[in-house]
Structures are given as C-alpha cells and as structure tokens.
Amino acid sequence: VKFQKDNGLKKTIFLIPNKNYKNEIKKAIKKSKIKTFKIHYYDTDPTKLTKQVEKITKYPQRKQNVKDEIKRLENSEDPNKEKKIKNLEKKDTIGKIGFDSLVIADFDESLKSITTSLIYTDVSPKKIYFITLNQWFDESLLKETSYQPIYYPSINKEMAGPIAYSSSI
C-alpha cells in the first residue's frame, strides 16, 4: 500500500496463474489491503498465454490505433504528415492500456513467460511498474535488462521484529 501511495499508483492489476493456489493469493491480496484495480487469472500454457496478455493489455486495439492514425494523417492536410507517419511506422502500438502497475503472482519460468508476453505486447517496465513476488534471488531475472526495472516486495525491518534463521544442514 505504501509503495502504491509513494509512486502515485491508482490502477494496479494482479496477474494470477490459474493454479490450485489462486484462492490463497486472492485471500492474501484482500488481507493486505493493497488497492486492486482488477484481477486477471491466466493459463500458464505458453500456447495460450500471449493471447491472454494481448487481451489484458488491449494489444489488438492499440496496434489498430497505429494503422488508424496513419490513415487519418494520410488523408489530412497536415504539413508535417510525412514526418508524423514515419514516426508512427516505427511504433508497434499507441494508446492506453488501462493500468499503471501490475503485480505478477508467479515464479520461475512462468514469471519469465508472462513478462516476455507483456514486453511483446508493447508494455514496458520503463512505463508501467512491474511488481513480482520475492524473486530477487533469481539472478536470471536481474540480468535480463528488458525486464528492468522490476520491483520486489520486502519486509519492514522495524515492523517485523527479530527474525530467526534455521538450517537443515
């Protein structure tokens, strides 16, 4: 909640895999009092994932917006239309996606798959806050520059009190 407030985030969506633990995640969200704009459940099957992400991010409409704007400019009297058209032809999409941040409640390869699908649909962590669960120990996520910046929750040391560590060695 503090992160949302500090960063002016008003439309946070949750992306939750459609797995047996989805209800636990939903309960935890409710208990945490995180302000949620929408919750989307997705199938982690890679053959279905990208289509689902395209729908969530309004990708087909944003892609069509580029074509429509080029057509509008071609038929206009705008003196700079060639330059504007050339700039539009470099873009994959234009338009709003409807959220300012997303929390991806997934791990490992599934997390990488959904992040890759988001980037494919022209949703960048440079414009939208990508937040995930405690995956800071996964160095491959940290090394992949297209995923950056990606945010991870942490505990408030003052509120947590003493922490006991155990080892099974």
Name each model-derived stretch.
Residues 1-107:
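Extracellular/periplasmic Venus flytrap/periplasmic-binding protein
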Residues 17-19, 107-109, 135-136, 155:
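Solvent-exposed coil/turn segments that connect beta secondary-structure elements
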Residues 34-40, 49, 54-82, 97-98, ...:
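Extracellular/periplasmic periplasmic-binding protein-like sensory domains
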Residues 101-119:
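Hydrophobic alpha-helical
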